[in-house]
Amino acid sequence: MKYLNTLFVTTQGAYLHKDGEALAIRVEGETRHKLPAHTLDGVICFGQVSMSPALMGHLAEKDVCVSFLSESGRFLARVAGPTHGNVLLRRRHYRLADDPEATADMARMILTGKLHNCRASLRRSARDHPERPGATALKAAADRLGGIIETLARHADVDALRGAEGEAGAVYFEAFPGMLLRDEPELRFSGRNRRPPLDPVNSVLSLLYTFLMHDVRSALESVGLDPQVGFLHRDRPGRPSLALDIMEEFRPVLADRMALTLFNRGMLGPKDFQIAPTGAVTLTDAARKTVITAWIERKRDEVEHPFLREKMPVGMLFFTQALLLARFLRGDLDGYPPYLWR
């Protein structure tokens, strides 16, 4: 299934080029791999990885987007083909985004999905490990998020909803350490930080959020939506606000839960990270490959979509949510149904 196939290239010095209809990977003058381009939905290149113009053009024609990241996983650039989609759909998208009341309604649905999933994640950890000293605190944080969810209907404008999001984020990340089962001082999580991440947990979260952004943005573009024009996130030049909006539903249940799994199961530990002179904490090459492999495998897991009541791979959820948003904008649905984890 095309929407599950993202190629990650981490070998430094690798050169990607077109070989007939295939993508070829050359390292030190030797061709190591060949892949049919039409089977891919994305390519993500880390660090010193180069690509021929002919391959870039070929991938763009096949609707395969390419993202270039620094070796540590920071987003640098993106190459994509022409924008597709019905211009009428985009017009409706822009009109809705210009309507304060409609924007608030849409932002409320997105935020409801995010907070529901944050709450579900906290409750899952408390239920799975009731013997842990922090289980009571996790339940209390989940209850506080439930209270914030109940207040969302009373917020009539987007600024008030953003304030509620900030409050909920503080509650969630204050409780986050209680979901970590490791006690090593090197793995201590003292709050969300980025640019640069200052501890191993934040380093993994930042990398997973980058992967999530790639997949969500690609899904939105594939159905003809403009990833720059959002509802919950403010418009800003170069900022993919709609992609950031839709990401919110998936951060707690895909990226955050995966980070917890990688640490709690011992797949990552203190030795898998290095500290730069600036204080930035980055993954080793081997650790980065561990995260990539886990992400690929997770996208292949099957789940039941809560709105459609159909089973599908996790990797299809982003595309499905993009389709549901497009259906709402066309008037086929009364409201946008966020992804609610169970």
Q: Which positions does each model-derived feature cover?
A:
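N-terminal ordered "arm"
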Residues: H17-V49
